[in-house]
Amino acid sequence: MKIVALTLVAFVALAGASCPYAAPAQAYSAPAAPSGYPAPPCPTNYLFSCQPNLAPAPCAQEAQAPAYGSAGAYTEQVPRYVGSPNREQVQQFHQRIGMAALMEELRGLGQGIQGQQY
């Protein structure tokens, strides 16, 4: 065990010695003027969902001063498809899970009885 530990320490020391020293990075300074890319043209955006229809989503308005580049062009809220369930929905879910487990258990018992010979 001591040999393994000694070998590991020697390997780590060798690996550390072979790596060049990296000087600490300089502090980041923000650019003087904001720069950005122009927003791509947006004729029609579609929000996709599980429903068969597509609903067009409007493009965001141009960014006002101070301009933040193209990041200001995409300010639409993220759609929320599923809200938090109420108590009745949670109870129905638990009942369905319980019934599914019961049906699976009864299926297993039925197959076990059919496979037995009397």
Swiss-Prot record:
Keywords: Secreted, Signal
Molecular functions (GO terms): structural constituent of vitelline membrane
Family annotation (InterPro entries): Vitelline_membr_Cys-rich-dom (IPR013135)
Compartment(s) of residence: Secreted
Example GO BP: vitelline membrane formation involved in chorion-containing eggshell formation
Gene Ontology cellular component list: egg chorion; extracellular space; vitelline envelope
Pfam family of the protein (one): Vitelline_membr
Cysteines paired by S-S bonds: none
Domain (VM): residue spans on this chain: 36-75
Similarity field: Belongs to the vitelline membrane family.
Job description of the protein: Major early eggshell protein.
UniProt-recorded name of the protein: Vitelline membrane protein Vm32E
Species of the source: Drosophila sechellia
UniProt gene name: Vm32E
